[in-house]
């Protein structure tokens, strides 16, 4: 039996496990702390320790093969702060993924899975709406969590990989 993990990277992202007709959906584990800058500000970080625990639990199950598909973060040279945040999140996620036993992984671009899983012509805010609606339709057991999170990107990534 093969298992697929979809990772919608970032502090507002999520993780999903899809195995045949079983699906699990979790929001990315995060925590807030004082910013590393001198400014009086809070930053949100990925909790690699909690992510370690979740991935270890998923990888300890008796699957023949388990692979993670990590969405490559969007980089915008004009948006320095957002780019730094995306890279910090990616690094924390990679630490946990690389520590998980038996877990192979690869990077994917959002367009790869969106082209297959979402309707043609979706752009901007419509992408999240379509993700939520399609995720609820394909994975009704996860619909409450999807609606709270407002999208099902990680589930759709994992389902795209499974197909």
What are these regions (language model features)?
Residues 1-163:
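Phosphate- and other anionic-substrate recognition elements at nucleic-acid/protein interfaces
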């Amino acid at each position: 039996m093969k298992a697929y993990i979809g990772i919608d990277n970032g502090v507002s992202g999520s993780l999903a496990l899809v195995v045949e007709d079983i699906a699990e959906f979790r929001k990315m584990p995060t925590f807030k702390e004082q910013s590393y800058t001198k400014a009086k500000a809070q930053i949100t970080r990925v909790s690699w320790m909690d992510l370690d625990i979740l991935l270890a639990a998923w990888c300890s199950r008796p699957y023949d093969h388990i692979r993670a598909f990590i969405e490559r973060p969007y980089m915008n040279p004009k948006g320095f702060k957002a780019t730094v945040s995306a890279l910090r999140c990616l690094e924390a996620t990679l630490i946990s993924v690389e520590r998980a036993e038996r877990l192979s992984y690869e990077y994917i671009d959002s367009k790869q899975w969106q082209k297959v899983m979402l309707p043609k012509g979706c752009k901007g805010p419509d992408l999240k709406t379509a993700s939520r609606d399609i995720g609820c339709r394909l994975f009704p057991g996860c619909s409450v969590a999807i609606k709270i999170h407002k999208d099902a990107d990680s589930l759709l990534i994992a389902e795209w990989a499974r197909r």
